[in-house]
Amino acid sequence: MPLTPADVHNVAFSKPPIGKRGYNEDEVDAFLDLVENELTRLIEENSDLRQRINELDQELAAGGGAGVTPQATQAIPAYEPEPGKPAPAAVSAGMNEEQALKAARVLSLAQDTADRLTNTAKAESDKMLADARANAEQILGEARHTADATVAEARQRADAMLADAQSRSEAQLRQAQEKADALQADAERKHSEIMGTINQQRAVLEGRLEQLRTFEREYRTRLKTYLESQLEELGQRGSAAPVDSNADAGGFDQFNRGKN
C-alpha cells in the first residue's frame, strides 16, 4: 500500500511503558513533519514527470501515427516507497526509431529520478534518525556522567563535613577533659593547702590546750599546797589566836605571784 503524506501526518505512536526508554515527542514530530514535506515534494515531482511523459507520448502519437502501442502511451504508476524499474515501453515497427529511443530515455530518466529522490529521502531519513539516536545517547550519557559527578561530589562534601564535625567534637572533648583535669588538680591543691593549714592550727591549739592543762595541774597543786599550809598554820596557832587577815592576804598574793 503506497505511503501518503496524510498517513505520515495522521500517524500516532503509543507511549512506552513506565521505565522504558522512548524518543522525545517534539523531535519525533519535527522529523515526521520533515518526512511529510519531503514525501509531498516527491509526489509532486513524480506527478510533474508523469504529466511530461504523457505530453511526450501525445507528441509521439501525433508524429508517428496510430502505430504506437498502448504501453508507449501508458503513464508511469503513482509514487510508491520502493517502486521497481519498469522496462522501456515497446514501440511499433512503424514508429520512428529516434522518437522511440527518445521516449525510452525520457521514461528511464523519470524512473531513475524517482528512484534517486526516493533513495535520497530514505538516506536522509535514516541519517536523521541515526543522528537523533546518537544525540539522545550522547545526552543520556552526559546526564548520567553529570549525575554521577554530582553524587560523587555530594558524597565527598558529606564525608568532609562528617570528618570536620568529628574533629571538632574530639577537640571539644579534649579541651573539656583538660579543663576538668586542671580544675580537679587545683581543687586537690587547695584541699591539701587547707588541710595543711588546719593541721597546723590544730597542732597549735593542741599545744595551747596542753599548756592550759599543765597550768591547771600546777595551779591546783600550788593551791592545795597553800591551803594545806594555811590549815597547818591555823592549827599551830590555836583556835584562840586571832587570824591576821593581812597576813592571809599577803600569803595569797605570794601564792599567785609564785603561780605566775
From Swiss-Prot:
Keyword Cytoplasm listed: yes
GO cellular component entries: cell pole; cytoplasm; peptidoglycan-based cell wall; plasma membrane
Location in or out of the cell: Cytoplasm
Database matches in InterPro entries: DivIVA_domain, DivIVA_fam
One GO BP: cell division
Region (Disordered) location: 233-260
SUPFAM superfamilies: Apolipoprotein A-I
Coiled coil: 31-64, 161-196
UniProt keyword annotations, A-Z: Cell cycle, Cell division, Cell shape, Coiled coil, Cytoplasm, Phosphoprotein, Stress response
Effect on the protein upon substituting T73 to A/S: Strong decrease in phosphorylation of Wag31
Modified residues (Phosphothreonine): T73
Disulfide bonds: none
Other noteworthy facts: Was identified as a high-confidence drug target.
Functional description taken from the UniProt entry: Important for maintaining cell shape and cell wall integrity by localizing peptidoglycan synthesis to the cell poles. Protects PbpB (PBP3, FtsI) from oxidative stress-induced cleavage.
Name the UniProt record assigns to this protein: Cell wall synthesis protein Wag31
